[in-house]
Amino acid sequence: MLLNIKKYNKYNNKIETMTLSAGNVTRMVASYSYNDISRLLSIKRSGNVLRGYDFAYDGLNRLEESTYAEGAGMSQNKNRYSENILSYSQNGSIERLQRYGKKNNGAFGLIDDLTYSYNGNQIKAISDKAGSLLYDGSFDFKDGANADVEYFYDANGALVKDLNKGISNIEYDILGNLKCITFSNGFKTKYIYDAAGYKLRTTHESAVTNTTDYIGNFIFEDGKLDKYLFGGGYCSFDNNQNPTFHYYEKDHLGSVRMVVNENGTIEPSHTFGVVGYVKEFDSYFNEVVSCPVFGKNNTDLEEKITIVEQ
């Protein structure tokens, strides 16, 4: 059984604690603290390890620092996953961003040192002085280009080319739905929708062509039933079409933090960075595991080809 208990401040209705339990065992307790004008100052999460962030803001109430730490006194492994916004543009857009995490040698340190340039409010280019991580499963920014203009848009403001991700062209249908992504290596991802704009099929054309079909709440991979989606999670099917149920436990933002299968086994837990990216996937057995279907705020995490907003 899954249980999510939230406690709110009776004066300002801000969340104070959230307790996630599965199989009658408490798996996570998150506590939130605020300053006198209700700005979030810290989030601390218990589980295998107590971990959390402390936040600092500038005079315009914009986030400047998010300092990560672990342990009862929040003094261990300090800055392992910290994020710092060093400057904003006059329009309020991020100009300099630093992220910390696991480096290629296994140590923790600076993994992203990003500088953003804009044309109005549209990102024109991003450079990374920290370089790219090489290990599988890394979530740093991949600086795949070194040009004055790396992002291109159409007249409607939709992205049509991304040099950093090797995307040479993005096509949209007349309703503005994503139709085809073409990569510089010739690979393509194509999408088909019904008249109402609901996605019916995704086709990944690479060395091998794979299809994903969506029929109501059913998902088929290469013609075989793979998942059935329902409000609190999904049901997966193995090669013999035997079902296994998986249940979501979400945080106060609606992001999936815990997945529990029908046997009460904890599946991957998700840890999101402060500036909108996944910083790690972990399980309660400290194993590296494959990510599930849905990510932050229930958006798709496409495992074959992914476009991530920075």
Question: What spans do the regions from the language model cover?
Answer:
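Extracellular/periplasmic ectodomains of large secreted or surface enzymes and adhesion receptors
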Residues: 21, 32, 110-153
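Structured, non-catalytic alpha/beta "coupling" segments that mediate domain-domain communication
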Residues: 1-3, 7-9, 86-124, 214-223
